[in-house]
């Protein structure tokens, strides 16, 4: 595995972790909070983004305007059943969600969730490192690399991992600061 391939794979892991971070509530409304909601639509689970336009008219409100009015009740039910704890308000054309301010206890829960997502991201990065080092060792065993070249490659893999873990830690610190900001 080349260094560019390894970096690309690690970049994807960091981006996946960032997408997970985006689903965690902060003190203000954000349409990405609803990214993981699937709606039963004509018998199939469909992502909410595919069924409606999501917007945030102000810092405390998320507005959902379905493309098909017949999906309104299903969307409302999916939001109410989600673990987000939102109560949707349906006016017959648009669903509005008032995002209440977070309690201190809820903020701490979300910080723990962010830490869990970051740890999952680190595990994915470490797995990529392990795979890359295994390939380098195999190449050394096959005679493609000398012992010194193998050690240099392994050091390069470790430095790449360290860089991406530091980036992940920075994203986690930013997200925690965002969650804890009142």
From Swiss-Prot:
GO biological process entries: translational termination
Signal peptide start and end residues: none
GO cellular component: cytoplasm
The keyword Cytoplasm appears for this protein: yes
Domain of life per record: Bacteria
InterPro entries: Ribosome_recyc_fac, Ribosome_recyc_fac_dom, RRF_sf
Record's subcellular location: Cytoplasm
GO molecular function: ribosomal large subunit binding
SUPFAM superfamilies (alphabetical): Ribosome recycling factor, RRF (SSF55194)
Keyword Ion transport: no
Annotated keywords: Cytoplasm, Protein biosynthesis
Family, similarity comment: Belongs to the RRF family.
HAMAP family: RRF
Its biological purpose: Responsible for the release of ribosomes from messenger RNA at the termination of protein biosynthesis. May increase the efficiency of translation by recycling ribosomes from one round of translation to another.
PANTHER family xrefs: MITOCHONDRIAL RIBOSOME RECYCLING FACTOR PSEUDO 1, RIBOSOME RECYCLING FACTOR
The protein's name: Ribosome-recycling factor
């Amino acid at each position: 595995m080349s260094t560019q391939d390894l970096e690309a794979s690690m970049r994807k892991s960091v981006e996946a972790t960032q997408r997970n971070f985006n689903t965690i509530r902060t003190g203000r409304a954000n349409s990405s909070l609803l990214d993981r909601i699937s709606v039963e639509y004509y018998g199939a689970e469909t992502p909410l983004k595919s069924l409606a336009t999501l917007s945030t008219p102000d810092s405390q409100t998320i507005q959902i305007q379905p493309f098909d009015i017949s999906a309104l009740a299903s969307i409302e039910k999916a939001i109410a059943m989600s673990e987000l704890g939102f109560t949707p308000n349906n006016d017959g054309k648009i669903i509005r969600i008032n995002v209440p301010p977070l309690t201190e206890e809820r903020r701490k829960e979300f910080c723990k969730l962010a830490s869990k997502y970051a740890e999952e991201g680190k595990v994915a990065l470490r797995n990529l490192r392990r795979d890359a080092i295994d390939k380098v060792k195999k190449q050394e065993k096959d005679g493609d690399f000398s012992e010194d070249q193998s050690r240099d490659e392994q050091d390069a893999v470790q430095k790449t991992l360290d860089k991406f873990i530091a980036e992940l830690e920075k994203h986690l610190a930013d997200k925690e600061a965002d969650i804890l900001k009142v």
